[in-house]
């Protein structure tokens, strides 16, 4: 009780702070000067379908349209729909791409023995050592199971 007279009352202070809204799809790094062009799909039997037990190629050009050279470029090819029995070759890193130059990149996509008929959706983009990410391209390709 003796303390009640000498102790000041604690007042609650509410501080409202505002933070910028984060949008998860945006890159928080410098925009990339890289652009993916001329995407082509080539399969062994030329039917424009990924068949079971077939090796296919995905070929595209990476163009440096930025103001500076790009370093440690990693082309990324993702299968978005998580279709099973599809194998994509590991990415090969491109160590240096001068401003205004282009490089042609080839990835292998293999259909496994147990591949099902359906549609696979792929996303292709590049990342750089500074964290910059290029614009992503999405496209779909039909898949077909093996017929006995």
Where do the PLM segments sit?
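Short, low-complexity, glycine-enriched hydrophobic/amphipathic alpha-helices that associate
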Residues: 1-14
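Low-complexity, acidic Ser/Thr/Pro/Gly-rich terminal tails and inter-domain linkers that flank the onset
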Residues: 14-52, 82, 139-148
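Terminal connector regions
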Residues: 19-23, 87-90, 106, 110-148
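Short, acidic/polar linear motifs in exposed loop/turn regions
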Residues: 45, 63-69, 113, 130
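Short beta-strand elements of extracellular/lumenal beta-sandwich folds
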Residues: 52-67
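Short acidic, flexible loop segments centered on an aromatic residue
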Residues: 63-84
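Short proline/glycine- and polar residue-rich coil/turn motifs
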Residues: 93-103
């Amino acid at each position: 009780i003796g303390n009640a007279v000498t102790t000041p009352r604690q007042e609650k202070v509410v501080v409202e702070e505002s933070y910028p809204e984060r949008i998860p799809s945006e890159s928080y790094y410098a925009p990339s000067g890289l652009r993916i062009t001329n995407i082509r799909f080539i399969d062994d039997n030329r039917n424009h379908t990924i068949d079971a037990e077939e090796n296919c190629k995905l070929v595209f050009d990476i163009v440096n349209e930025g103001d500076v050279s790009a370093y440690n470029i990693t082309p990324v090819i993702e299968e978005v729909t998580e279709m099973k029995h599809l194998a994509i070759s590991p990415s090969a890193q491109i160590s240096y791409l001068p401003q205004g130059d282009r490089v042609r990149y080839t990835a292998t996509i293999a259909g496994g023995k147990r591949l099902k008929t359906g549609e696979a959706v792929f996303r292709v983009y590049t990342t750089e050592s500074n964290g910059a990410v290029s614009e992503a391209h999405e496209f779909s390709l039909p898949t077909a199971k093996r017929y006995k």
